[in-house]
Structure formats: structure tokens, C-alpha cells
Regions:
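TPR/TPR-like (Sel1-like) alpha-helical repeat modules
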Residues: 107-110, 123-146, 174
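TPR-repeat structural position
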Residues: 22-25, 60, 95, 128
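Alpha-helical adaptor scaffolds
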Residues: 41-117
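Flexible helix-coil transition and linker loops at the boundaries of alpha-helical arrays
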Residues: 31-40, 70-76, 144-145
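Alpha-solenoid helical repeat scaffolds
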Residues: 30-34, 68, 103, 136
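Residue at a conserved register position within TPR or TPR-like alpha-solenoid repeats
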Residues: 16-19, 54, 89, 122, ...
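N-terminal alpha-helical interaction modules that lie
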Residues: 1-57, 172-175
Length: 175
């Protein structure tokens, strides 16, 4: 069993970036999650990192399993694992399932980081109206001065430009 530190995870991530070996990193993160006893981040957060690496390695089905494991674990994560589940379902060509997961997130509560992820996912898969709604709701849920709010404002602005909409009061906050 292992106590996992942020420094340990940072080293793993740095090595993977240098080697461009997402498979190896995903396997190491899986092993850390299996042996997890305690740490500076939750087991669920490690599972989400593993899921993201499996996606980068071209193995979306394995990524989907890890996102689901993170959701089942229930530990603290910056972004709701259901956002990753939805994105991966879109990637797998299962858009109807992805939309159901997104609707569930909307109905059960979310944080601004989750709203950003869902907005970006919907925009990537062509649902600009849905993406705009998530980005707008995310902005409105954030207090001023929060970094994620700026990211939501930028995403929202890009979506509005893609939709051909004129600048509005929220767009003006981008200064």
C-alpha cells in the first residue's frame, strides 16, 4: 500500500511528457490507484489522471472504465468524473449516452471546472448551443477573480464567435 504525494505524481507526469509514453504512465497510475492507502490527493483523482492518460494512449474504452472507477470511488476530484465519462462516450461514438450523462450532471449539481469541461466537450462535438449554456452557467456560478472564471469567459466568447453572436455584457468582462 502506498501514500501518494503530489511530488510523486508530478515526477511521473514529467517523465511521461519527456518520453511521450502515455501507456506506461497510465499503467503506473493504475498501479498507484490499486495500492492507494492515503495521500495528498484522492484515489479518485489518481483514477481520473489514469483515465486521461489512457485516452492519450488511444485506449478510450479503458479510459471509460477508469472514469467510472473514479465516480464509484467518490473521492474528491477537481472535475466531476462524469464529465470525462461523457467526453469519452462521445469519442466512442455513443453520443446519446454522453448526452444522458451530461443531463445527469446538470440535474445533480456541478462545479465551474466541470462546467468548463462539459462546455469544451460539447463544443468539440458540434453542440455549440449546449456548450454556450454550460459556459454561461459556469461563469455565472463563479465569483470574480477565480482563474476558472477567466477560462470559462474565454471559452464562452469563442463559442459565441463561432455562433455568430454579438458581444454581450459577459464578453466585456474578458478585458
Amino acid at each position: 500500500m502506498a501514500h501518494v504525494t503530489r511530488e510523486q505524481l508530478d515526477r511521473l507526469l514529467d517523465q511521461a511528457l519527456l518520453l511521450d509514453d502515455h501507456d506506461a504512465l497510465a499503467c503506473r497510475l493504475d498501479a498507484l490507484a490499486r495500492g492507494y492507502e492515503s495521500g495528498e490527493m484522492s484515489r479518485a483523482a489518481i483514477l481520473v489522471l489514469a483515465a486521461e492518460e489512457w485516452r492519450q494512449a488511444g485506449r478510450p474504452a479503458t479510459a471509460l472504465d477508469r472514469f467510472r472507477d473514479a465516480l464509484e470511488d467518490g473521492g474528491e476530484v477537481p472535475v466531476d468524473p462524469r464529465a470525462g465519462i461523457a467526453d469519452t462516450l462521445f469519442e466512442l461514438g455513443r453520443a446519446d449516452e454522453a448526452r444522458k450523462v451530461i443531463a445527469e450532471v446538470g440535474a445533480r449539481g456541478w462545479n465551474p471546472a466541470t462546467a468548463l469541461t462539459i462546455a469544451e466537450t460539447l463544443a468539440a462535438y458540434g453542440d455549440l448551443d449546449g456548450a454556450l449554456e454550460w459556459a454561461t452557467d459556469g461563469v455565472l456560478a463563479c465569483p470574480a477573480g477565480i482563474t476558472i472564471r477567466d477560462a470559462l469567459l474565454r471559452t464562452r466568447y469563442r463559442i459565441r464567435v463561432d455562433l455568430g453572436l454579438p458581444e454581450d455584457d459577459l464578453d466585456a468582462l474578458l478585458c
